[in-house]
Structures are given as C-alpha cells and as structure tokens.
Amino acid sequence: MTIPFRVGQGFDVHALVTGRPLIIGGVRIEHSHGLLGHSDADVLLHAVTDAILGAAGLGDIGRHFPDTDPRFKGADSRVLLREAMARVDAAGWQVVNVDATVHAQAPKIGPHAPAMVANIAADLGIAHDLVNIKAKTNEGLGYLGRKEGIAATVVTLLARQA
C-alpha cells in the first residue's frame, strides 16, 4: 500500500551564551546572547530540518550533517535546510506545510516571524502561507524561562510527489 502523506516532528534546543550572534529562522536578531552550537545553532531551522527528514524516513540532521564533521563548523543552517530538502525531494516527497513554535523568554520572536517565514518558504520551495511560526515564552519556568536557552518544535506534513 502506498501512503500518500507523512507527518514529521522536529525539536531542537541550544544554550544562550555571550559572544555569538543570535540567528533564528535564518534571521540575525540583535540580542546580548547568541546560541551555542557547532554550526550557526539556528534552533528553528534545525527543528524544521529534522521534521522534513523524519517525515521522509531519512533520519535526522545529525545523520546528514554531524557536529563531529569539521565541514559543518559554523555552517549556515539555511544551506543545510536546502540540502535536506533536496534529499527529501529526491526521495519523492514534497512539503505540504510547516507549523513551528519557538520557545524563548527573550527576545520577542513575533517581530521577526515574517522574515523567518519568508526564509523557510524559500528554502523549502513552498508558498509563504504554508509556513506558520508561533512564539511562546516559558512563563519564567525552567531553563527557557531563566533565559538559558531557546527551543523550537516543528510539525510538518509531506505528500508524495505527483
């Protein structure tokens, strides 16, 4: 039986540290802290990448772009997302939609969401109205509420290519 649709879920979290730029959804945001990681540590794009790879049955971001590989040191996560999308496409899938939540006590994500939507839509080759980004604080609770990190969760739907 051929299944015409697949759902993928992605999650990522990175610690906030001084001395690094803050890049979320491919958008550089002015902030006192940035995200720590091997690449540019774009928590949102990493979660999107995991969601599309997972839905296509292709594993996760670590399988394709391991943080032990020096080629990905400081890598632009938009480049990684486009490469992951090429692999999803080669496997016969297309993205139907992306629904994402960025979990951050600070900074405010809302003002940057339209640019993030535009980046993700462009990198996945889909219309802007097929990408949704929400922002949530942790109401001061836990490591996110203490502003020690930022997390992202993503759900995506893929359809078999016609």
Swiss-Prot record:
Gene3D superfamilies: 2-C-methyl-D-erythritol 2,4-cyclodiphosphate synthase
Annotated catalysed reactions: 4-CDP-2-C-methyl-D-erythritol 2-phosphate = 2-C-methyl-D-erythritol 2,4-cyclic diphosphate + CMP
UniProt remark on cofactor binding: Binds 1 divalent metal cation per subunit.
Superkingdom of the organism of origin: Bacteria
EC number assigned by the record: 4.6.1.12
Enzyme class: lyase
InterPro entries found in the cross-reference section: MECDP_synthase, MECDP_synthase_CS, MECDP_synthase_sf
Cofactor dependency: a divalent metal cation
GO terms of molecular function: 2-C-methyl-D-erythritol 2,4-cyclodiphosphate synthase activity; metal ion binding
Any one GO BP annotation for this protein: terpenoid biosynthetic process
Pathway field: Isoprenoid biosynthesis; isopentenyl diphosphate biosynthesis via DXP pathway; isopentenyl diphosphate from 1-deoxy-D-xylulose 5-phosphate: step 4/6
Keyword line: Isoprene biosynthesis, Lyase, Metal-binding
Subunit text: Homotrimer.
Function: Involved in the biosynthesis of isopentenyl diphosphate (IPP) and dimethylallyl diphosphate (DMAPP), two major building blocks of isoprenoid compounds. Catalyzes the conversion of 4-diphosphocytidyl-2-C-methyl-D-erythritol 2-phosphate (CDP-ME2P) to 2-C-methyl-D-erythritol 2,4-cyclodiphosphate (ME-CPP) with a corresponding release of cytidine 5-monophosphate (CMP).
Protein's name in the database: 2-C-methyl-D-erythritol 2,4-cyclodiphosphate synthase
Name of the encoding gene: ispF
